[in-house]
Regions:
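Conserved hydrophobic beta-strand positions in leucine-rich repeat
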Residues: 6-8, 25-29, 46-50, 67-71, ...
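Short "repeat-start/strand-capping" segments in structured domains, especially the N-termini
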Residues: 2-3, 21-24, 42-45, 63-66, ...
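Leucine-rich solenoid repeat scaffolds
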Residues: 162-178
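Consensus "Asn ladder" position of solenoid repeat domains
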Residues: 11, 32, 53, 71-74, ...
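Intrinsically disordered, low-complexity linker/propeptide segments enriched in Ser/Thr/Gly/Pro
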Residues: 1-8, 17, 38, 101, ...
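Leucine-biased recognition of intrinsically disordered, low-complexity hydrophobic segments
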Residues: 3-6, 13, 34, 55, ...
């Protein structure tokens, strides 16, 4: 269809299928009760805002143009963004993620993954990161030496024993309390 923008936020939707909406570039479906979201055929999608739902999985493998993903406060147990190389903003806080691979997402400037169950996080390939929120996880180490553009680093409530920010000369805010 010719539909390019769909806003259906703040309802009580439990499922949404936009797989036939090939021209869709923006989907806002936040604040619903979604347990199923099919965006597989929406290859033009650049903005997906689906936070505060009940999603346990999200297949983004065909959404290679995706630039912004805001999917916090769901029940995601895994999130594969390896094909989403255009991502600049990834917000996946307050889910149930135990791992997150952002090595292919070299355009990322903002990564919010707080409130998950991450035991490790490799951001060495994300050299454009300016904003990293990874608090309230189970990280035992965090290497931000490659992230020289970082302005904000929130890594509180983890299990870090050391943190080297000597390369992060642009850092304006650092929260690493327990």
């Amino acid at each position: 269809t010719a539909l390019t923008e769909l806003r259906c936020e703040n309802n009580q939707l439990t499922s949404l299928d936009v797989s036939k909406n090939t021209a869709l570039t923006e989907l806002r479906c936040e604040n619903n009760q979604l347990t199923s979201l099919n965006v597989s055929g929406a290859a033009a999608l650049t903005d997906l805002i689906c936070y505060n739902n009940q999603l346990t999985s999200l297949d983004l493998s065909t959404n290679t143009l995706l630039d912004h993903l805001r999917g916090w406060s769901n029940q995601l147990t895994s999130l594969d963004v390896s094909n989403n190389t255009a991502l600049t903003e990834l917000f996946c806080s307050v889910n149930q993620l135990t791992s997150l691979d952002v090595s292919n997402n070299t355009a990322l400037t903002e990564l919010f993954c707080s409130g998950n169950q991450l035991t490790s996080l490799d951001v060495s390939a994300n050299t454009d990161l300016t904003n990293l929120h990874c608090g309230s996880n189970q990280l035992t180490s965090l290497d931000v030496s490659s992230n020289t553009a970082l302005n904000y680093l929130y890594c509180y409530s983890n299990q870090l024993t050391s943190l080297d920010v000597s390369s992060n000369t642009n850092l304006e805010r650092l929260w690493c309390y327990e």
